[in-house]
Amino acid sequence: METGILIVIFISCLLVSFTGYAVYTAFGQPSKKLRDPFEEHED
C-alpha cells in the first residue's frame, strides 16, 4: 500500500474514535457526572 493511503486510514480512524468517545461522554454513562450551568443559575 502507498504511504498516503495508510495516513488517510490512520487519520480517519482517529477522527471516528474521537467522535465516538465524544458521543459516549455526552450521552452515555459519564454524562450523569456532567453539570448543567444553566440549571444552576437562578433568575
From Swiss-Prot:
Pfam families: PsbN. It comes from the Eukaryota. InterPro entries: PSII_PsbN (IPR003398). Keywords: Chloroplast, Membrane, Plastid, Thylakoid, Transmembrane, Transmembrane helix. One of its GO terms (biological process) is photosynthesis. May play a role in photosystem I and II biogenesis. This is Protein PsbN. It comes from Coleochaete orbicularis (Charophycean green alga).
